Amino acid sequence: MLSAKHIELVKSTIPLLESAGTDITEYFYQRMFKHNPELKHIFNMSNQRSGGQPAALFSAIAAYAKNIENLAALSGAVERIAHKHTSLNIQPEHYPIVGHHLLATLRELAPEAFTTEVEEAWAAAYGLLAGIFINREDELYQKNANQLGGWLGARQFKVIEKRQESSLVTSFVFAPIDGESVVDYQAGQYLGIKVEPANHEYREMRQYSLSDKPNGKTYRISVKREDSRTPGNEPGTVSNYLHDQVNIGDVLDVFPPAGDFHYVERNEPVVLISAGVGVTPMQSMLEMLASKALDKPVFYLHACENLAQHSFNERVQALTNELKLTHHTWYRDLDGNEQEALNSQGQSNSGSVNSHMGFMNLVPLKAELPLDKGDFYLCGPVAFMSFVKQQLIELGVEDTRIHYEVFGPHSDL
C-alpha cells in the first residue's frame, strides 16, 4: 500500500498533468521507442501516429492520480486493459521498462515540480499499479492455458476460409495447424493476431472481434478494409494486408481470445446495436443466441451506409426466422436497385425486418424496445455510440444496462 505522504505527493501533481495534457504521453512514447525500439513490435504504431494511444494513456494516468485513494473506481479500466495486454502477450518484464520511461518523462518535462520526493512517490504508485496488472494478467493467462484447447503466447493457425461479407468487410476462418481443439470464448470477445507484412520494419499486432459462436475447432474474425479513416490519414496497415495478402493456406500467429465486453447470460430481452464493422461482436452474440434457442426477445439494430456495405445481412435475415428477432436497419444512401431490394423484404414468421433512412433514431421505437429491463450492447464509431447512448438514457434506460466496445484506444462515451 502507498503511504499517506506518497498519496499526497501524487495528488499534488494533478494540476501539472492536466496542464501538460497529452504532451506528456506523446513525449513518453517517443522516448520509449527511441531507447527500446523492440517495443514497436508490440504497440500499434498506427494508433501512435493518429494520436489515439497517447490520448488514451494520458486519460489513464490522470484517472489513476485522481483515484489514487480509491482504486476500486478503476477496476473496470484495469480489467479492460489487462485483457488487451494478454492479447498482446505483455509480460512482467515489460513493466519496468514502461515505468522507467514514464518517470524519466515527468522528470525531463517538469524538472522543478518533479522533485526527488515526488519521483519516489510516483515510483511507488507505478509499482503498485504494475503489480495489480501483473497479477490480473497472470490470472487471465493461466485461465486460458488451463482450459480445454487453451494455450499461452502465440499459436500458429492456418487460414481455412476467406469470404467477403460486404464491399468493405472480409471474414477469415482460422484453424490451428496442430489439429487440436481451441479454447472457447464469450460472444463479444476479440482475437489477437500477429502479422509480418513484407518490407515492413516491425511486426504488427492487432485485435479483431470474433464474429461467430464458439465451436471448439476454429475462430472467425471479420475485418473491415480501412482505406483511410479520414482525409489525409494513412490506410490501415494490417486490414489492407489481410485483405490483399493473406489467403487460404497462409499461417498466422494467434493469441487466445480476450476482452471484457461480452454477452452476459440473463433472462431479460437483449438489444444489439451496431454501426459499420461494429456489427462483428454483435454477430457473434446473435449466432450464440440462435444456437441456444433462447425463448426471449432479441432486437438487432444496425446502421450502415448502404446495402453493399451491410455485412451479414442475408445471415441475419435467416436468423430472423429462427429467433424472436426484431431487426431494424438504418441506411444513409441507397441507389434504386438497393431500394427495390429492401422493398421486397417482407415480414418473417417469428420476427420482423424493418429498414429506415438516415441516422438511427430510437424515439419511434420507444413502445417496442424493452427500455425498462433489456440489456443493451453497443459497438461502432465512438460518435455513433455516444449518440445512441444519449438517446437510451433520455428514454429511461439505466446506465448499468448499457455495455459498449470501442475499437482502438478506449474512449468514454
Predicted regions and their residues:
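Conserved S-adenosyl-L-methionine
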Residues: 288-297
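Globin-like tetrapyrrole-binding proteins
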Residues: 1-154
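Short, conserved phosphate/pyrophosphate- and ester-handling motifs at nucleotide-, phospho-/glycolipid
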Residues: 188, 278, 381
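A phosphate-binding catalytic loop at a beta-strand-loop-alpha-helix junction
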Residues: 269-288
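A short, basic/flexible loop-to-alpha-helix module at the beginning of a structural domain
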Residues: 243, 255-267
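Ferredoxin-reductase
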Residues: 147-250, 304-306, 317, 330-334
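Reductase modules of NAD(P)H-dependent flavoproteins
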Residues: 72, 298-413
